[in-house]
């Protein structure tokens, strides 16, 4: 354990016994850290905090921006702690022991059982709802995908609300607008996004708490050289409210990038 801690540059967090708390300071995925170290690359850490008032984090943003690795890191560090290992985060981090840890990550399609990806995911959601409580942590990657976006998004919203009612702690990654809106007004649920350079259209791999992120779908399509008429036609298929919201998120990201440059 000591050798592993030294190799990973891991530390012992403060253990909170009388409260449910996950307060990670400069956390990073241990496997990503080792991979980047071998390649001479820097690993960008993140910070996040969960407590009785802010229990469920909804992470949005573009593909390949770091949403899934952030979710996996939070879950892995919790498991490392409960296995008696130091965690890859600053020693000022605070954590508590959690009784139940649930995860829905990756493609769960089963040929043997005749289950589609979405059916398999729904079975997991059913299990979560049956067993989750105030001493539970759930991790759901790409929540609601695998079905019709409107219907899948609506079902994901009511499931998330129910898990919130159970006072569970959780991390969800999504592209669904309705989940971002839910996190913006529902007590107990909060937004977070992976930062993205809106000019170069490259991910910054930084977690920003308190606001949703754009998926930059049309911007990426434009940069890849997809016909502009096709992009405009696709925009025309969306409601004006969705297009307006995505533009506002893009503009907010641009302003943040400019502000960061001024600070330097």
Give the location of each predicted region.
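Extended, charged alpha-helical coiled-coil/arm scaffolds that mediate oligomerization and mechanical coupling
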Residues: 1-4
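ATPase nucleotide-binding head domains, primarily ABC-like/P-loop NTPase cores
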Residues: 6-262
